[in-house]
UniProtKB/Swiss-Prot annotation:
It catalyses: shikimate + NADP(+) = 3-dehydroshikimate + NADPH + H(+). This is Shikimate dehydrogenase (NADP(+)). Gene3D superfamilies: Leucine Dehydrogenase, chain A, domain 1 (3.40.50.10860), NAD(P)-binding Rossmann-like Domain (3.40.50.720). It comes from Pyrococcus abyssi (strain GE5 / Orsay). The active site is at 63 (proton acceptor). One of its GO terms (biological process) is chorismate biosynthetic process. One of its GO terms (molecular function) is shikimate 3-dehydrogenase (NADP+) activity. Keywords: Amino-acid biosynthesis, Aromatic amino acid biosynthesis, NADP, Oxidoreductase.
Length: 264
């Protein structure tokens, strides 16, 4: 039996085991997906090699720091210095990022994204990956609490700035994406409701709660909203394909996730 898993801190909230284990069953793959709450990342990666764990997802707070423990990075992962998927290839650990593609596919499920103006809040591992991927097809502004981190993405043709500049850019945006953890398990939002307008498409990468404060506010003014579960599903589907060669059933992933959340 092959073992796959998720490393991060915290990980107990994750829906990844529910999704991937359902997929292993569907496709008759002798494998299991588990979570590992990790305190010491370097030792955990040594354990992956020693135990022969076949593959990993990586979540907060390790998406960037994990890169220095790996043997090889995909071009995208190297460009943004962020990894959320690892393949163990006969003891050689190769890092990939599927966050950007996951976000793009989630958006494209609901709207045309090419040539649109996209405002991304947050320049951490997920925010960077989303900005890098969408910069290939759309106009991107990234705002971050630490502006220098957002400005470091300007090499990809995006504009970076401070979250304090939010009121200046919401009117410009066709799509707004919260790529921070603000709203996870709290009733907080980075975006005051008064700045939202009904033409805006609003996406949140947070999926617990499924309807964050940001999405509730956006719905209340008539915006189209995309919950964080869609991005989780599509980035997870890309990870599954890297591990198995199979692009999986995303509708099954959504269904089992909603059942676990009690919203099936």
């Amino acid at each position: 039996m092959k073992v796959y898993g998720l490393i991060g801190k915290p990980v107990s909230h994750s829906l990844s085991p529910v999704m991937h284990n359902a997929l292993f069953r569907k496709y008759g793959i002798d494998a299991v997906y588990v979570t590992f709450e990790v305190e010491e990342l370097g030792k955990a990666i040594d354990g992956v090699r020693a135990l022969g764990i076949s593959g990993l997802n990586v979540t907060m707070p390790y998406k960037e720091v994990v890169t220095k423990f790996l043997d090889e990075l995909s071009e995208d992962a190297r460009e943004i210095n962020s990894v959320n998927t690892i393949i163990n290839l006969e003891g050689s650990l190769i890092g990939y990022t599927t966050d950007g593609v996951g976000a793009r596919k989630a958006l494209e499920r609901f709207t045309e994204i090419e040539g649109r103006n996209v405002l991304i809040l947050g320049a951490g591992g997920a925010g960077k990956a989303i900005a890098y991927e969408l910069s290939k097809i759309a106009n991107i502004v990234v705002l971050n609490r630490t502006p220098s981190k957002a400005k470091s993405l300007e090499k990809f043709g995006v504009k970076g700035g401070s979250l304090d500049e939010l009121p200046n850019y919401v009117g410009w945006a066709d799509v707004l994406i919260n790529a921070t953890s603000v709203g996870m398990g709290t009733n907080e939002s980075l975006v005051p409701r008064r700045l939202l307008r009904r033409e805006l498409i609003v996406m949140d990468i947070v999926y617990k709660p499924l309807k964050t404060r940001l999405l509730r506010d956006a719905e209340s003014v008539g915006c189209r909203v995309i919950d964080g579960l869609w991005m989780l599903i599509y980035q997870g589907a890309e990870s599954f394909k890297l591990w198995t060669g199979i692009y999986p059933d995303v509708e099954l992933m959504r269904r089992v996730s909603l059942e676990r959340l009690g919203k099936g």
